[in-house]
Design a protein with these regions (language model features):
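N-terminal carbohydrate-binding accessory modules
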Residues: 1-50, 63, 78-86, 416-417
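Short, acidic/polar
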Residues: 21-45, 136-142, 258-268, 351-362, ...
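Polysaccharide-binding and catalytic clefts of secreted carbohydrate-active enzymes
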Residues: 103, 110-317, 321
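Carbohydrate-binding surfaces of carbohydrate-active enzymes
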Residues: 284, 300-569
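Aromatic-lined substrate-binding rim segments of carbohydrate-active enzymes
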Residues: 36-117, 141-144, 239-247, 359, ...
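The substrate-binding groove and active-site-proximal loops of carbohydrate-active enzymes
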Residues: 11-32, 54-71, 118-137, 159-166, ...
Length: 569
């Protein structure tokens, strides 16, 4: 059961009226109010029931250190309420004002080299910094106190797409060393666990630890990524606790999750939230084919480079990942309105007729209770000026708006089905530790011979597509979400289990053996359990813990130069 208790499906778009407040007039020269009124008329006619606002404009809320401007949003919320539209209001901490960088240089995020991140982008701060949180607290508090009682507000988004980058500030590195002291107790314990005799890397003291910029040790890498994920989670929990004290009963707290951001553990982030909200961006046009057709060599997929997977199964996989974050239904706070291009990553692939509605219905079938597009207005400026919204640059309704309205009708037609719980005959263990390990030492290779950092996701989709093609539902469950004490119950619930865990604990491997002994059908992908959770290779005969049970083992493995059919289907 989700934290919110609304009935039916919700539908809408992110709405950034503030981006147009200095430029919008109609043909008669009227002010912004005319444009705003037209927007809400179009929203109401198209079936919008939710908008998301306010999360990207800290400088609009707080133009100067001691000056706040809070009233500009009220007319938008009033009009939303008058039209029966609920609002998710965001805290603006992911896009910081220039004055923060100038007045507080110590909060600027650092690259691995130690150089500060240049201004001009977003998510460019060290959010573990006490000083940064002290800057965040007043603007968060002012916004929430001002609008928590507004009748349009249904929920709050804290930050946005957290974990975008790895942080390398001195304070982050110091807290990393402290975490290693806590985990290993002594420097001898760390030296032994990580095998630091190799290449003369043994340390005299934790203060001797090298910076991550020069690291080549897999155990260091996994510990560093785990620490980054912990910092992201702590920042969200800090914001959640601050906001929780101020909001009205019945309002939920979420964040917009971009799955598998570098500084985040996707399957632990839900512990900080009342409800899961995600980006569901997918390849359109031929990128929604099934079975998945990989692009020809040298030809890019019909999606931005940061959408790593294509095919109809990839859309389902994203949704099942979203549902796995809290093992419950979820909200889609961003998805393709039209082409999704940003800066140098161009991907002008607007939907084929019918795909807009097809994708939305697909999301709902996998547990989405809100489908919200990014965004309402296509922007005339900024790096996302080619990111198509529901309305084009002209702000005149066109084909996308018509598809948007048509999809709302289709969703209303299935509201009577109630809260849908997707079927899941197959379970897949999702291992974030393995994702990180494969980014460094992946099982797959690129055409240039280098490791494919998307090895984990590509293998996951191949496994997922087998179930998808067979018409079987899939449940993704994080390695830390399993009840390792009840393999018998898990086998009764899930007839098949795919253990997609290159890095695995002894307890997880024992659970999988007990699951199979209880009658479950256990599937082991390549290199299952090959390393421990700390990245050190297991020395048992592979597959570790399963050779005797399977009656099969291996000592060698090979990359493939081209696909090879193992058997005919």
């Amino acid at each position: 059961m989700m934290a919110h208790e609304w009935s039916g499906l919700r539908y809408g778009a992110a709405y950034y009226n503030e981006y147009h407040q200095e430029r919008i007039t109609d043909e008669a020269g009227n002010e912004l109010a005319a444009r705003t009124e037209e927007d809400f008329r179009l929203m109401s006619e198209a079936g919008v029931t939710v908008i998301r606002v306010g999360e990207s404009v800290w400088a609009r809320w707080q133009p100067e250190p001691n000056r706040f401007d809070l009233d500009w949003l009220e007319p938008i919320l009033d009009r939303a309420h008058a039209n029966g539209i609920g609002v998710i209001l965001g805290t603006p901490t992911y896009a910081v004002p220039r004055w923060v960088f100038i007045d507080h240089p110590s909060v600027i995020a650092h690259h691995a080299t130690g150089a500060p991140v240049a201004y001009g982008h977003r998510q460019n701060v060290d959010y573990s910094s006490v000083e940064f949180r002290a800057l965040c607290e007043p603007v968060i508090t002012k916004i929430v106190e001002r609008y928590a009682s507004h009748p349009s507000i249904i929920g709050w988004q804290i930050d946005n797409e957290p974990g975008a980058y790895l942080l390398h500030n001195d304070g982050v590195f110091d807290s990393f060393k402290d975490s290693l002291r806590d985990e290993y107790g002594s420097i001898d314990g760390l030296n032994a666990a990580w095998g630091l005799t190799y290449w003369s890397h043994a340390l005299r003291d934790f203060e001797d630890l090298w910076r991550p910029d020069g690291n080549t040790n897999p155990s260091y890498l996994l510990a560093w990524r785990k620490h980054q994920a912990r910092l992201t989670k702590e920042f969200l929990q800090w914001q959640r606790d601050l906001v929780r004290k101020l909001i009205a009963p019945g309002q939920f707290i979420t964040t917009c999750v971009a799955i598998n951001r570098p500084g985040m553990d996707t399957f632990s982030i839900g512990e900080s939230l009342d409800a899961t909200s995600v980006n569901v961006y997918y390849a359109s046009q031929d990128g929604l084919e099934h079975p998945t057709r990989q692009p020809s060599p040298g030809v890019a997929a019909p999606a931005p480079i940061w959408v790593p997977l294509t095919g109809a199964s990839a859309l389902n996989l994203i949704c099942d990942t979203a549902r796995g974050i809290k093992q419950e239904n979820f909200l889609v706070t961003e998805t393709n309105g039209s082409s999704i291009s940003q800066g140098p990553a161009m991907a002008a692939f607007p939907h084929y007729p019918g795909q807009f509605k097809q994708a939305a219905l697909n999301m709902v079938s996998r547990g989405a209770e809100l489908v919200e597009y990014w965004h309402w207005h296509t922007l005339p400026y900024g790096v996302e000026n080619y990111w198509g919204g529901i309305l084009p640059h002209s702000l005149k309704p066109g084909r996308t708006y018509a598809q948007f309205a048509e999809t709302a009708v289709a969703l209303r037609a299935i509201e009577s089905l109630g809260r849908l719980t997707p079927a899941a005959e197959v379970a897949i263990v999702y291992s974030t530790s393995s994702l990180w390990a494969f980014e460094f030492q992946g099982s797959l290779r690129q055409p240039n011979g280098m490791v494919d950092p998307k090895s984990y996701e590509r293998t996951l989709q191949s496994l997922y597509e087998i179930a998808y093609s067979a018409g079987l539902g899939v449940r993704l469950i994080g390695e830390t979400q399993l009840d390792l004490g009840d393999p018998v119950g898990f086998a009764a619930q899930h007839p098949a289990l795919i253990l997609h865990a290159y890095a695995a604990s002894d307890e997880l491997l024992e659970f999988a053996r007990a699951y199979a002994a209880a009658g479950g059908r256990l599937i082991l992908p390549p290199r299952t359990g090959y390393v421990r959770l700390d990245g050190v290779m297991r020395t048992e005969v592979a597959p570790a813990g399963f050779a005797a049970v399977l009656g099969a083992s291996y000592n060698e493995y090979s990359n493939l130069n081209e696909p090879v059919a193992a058997f005919d289907v």
